[in-house]
Amino acid sequence: MNEMIGQLGNLYTGAIADTLDELGYHNQCLPSDIRPLADSMKVAGPVYTVLGKRRHYDDGVDPRYRQMDMLDAIPSGAVIIVEPGNEFSAAHWGELMTNTALQRGAKGIVINGGLRDSLQILDVGFPAFRKYHSPLTAAYRWNIDSFHIPIKVGNVTIEPGDYVLGDIDGVLIIPQAIIQEVVEQTVAVATKEDVVRASLQDGGNIRELFEEYKVF
């Protein structure tokens, strides 16, 4: 399994998306406005899902304890995916959560919402994908409802056990049932693309190369 995750991490989303299309999975890309904090950032691995909802200042609950519960349950090697639900103003992730997640062995985070402490997160090199930035704390605005459960981000349903690959071009969810097939098929195509790329750079003809390798 670790070898397969390593192979997934060496691939890129465009190649994986093509394979998913060929296998009939046409709706696996998260919203296109979820972007990496730095262009070079990449995430790959099994998902750890988090679902939240808006809260009010005076509801008498300190949501930070629930946040700590969520952090304690992160499996080593997982990529955290946060769906904030109906809260669109606060930062749902920050520096201290990042450092705690690193302690737990998390490989990155994808948030369909807000991020703060961006420079500090860049300093520790934790791959983070987010929709927007906000200085506002989530403590008075947002609760974590549940984690490690099925969630929906945009139009994509994500199940515990699924896999994620994210890079500068976007974030893809790969269902657990087909992960091995997707990786193996994409590696085979990527090998052909490497040959075609080298041939083109050496003056090859794209039509002839396409007829031979069927990649373009």
Regions found by a protein language model. Give the residues of each.
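Feature captures the catalytic cores and cofactor-binding loops of soluble hydro-lyases/lyases
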Residues: 1-160, 174-216
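C-terminal binding/interaction regions
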Residues: 164
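Channel- or pocket-lining gating/hinge segments that regulate access to a cavity or pore
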Residues: 170-172
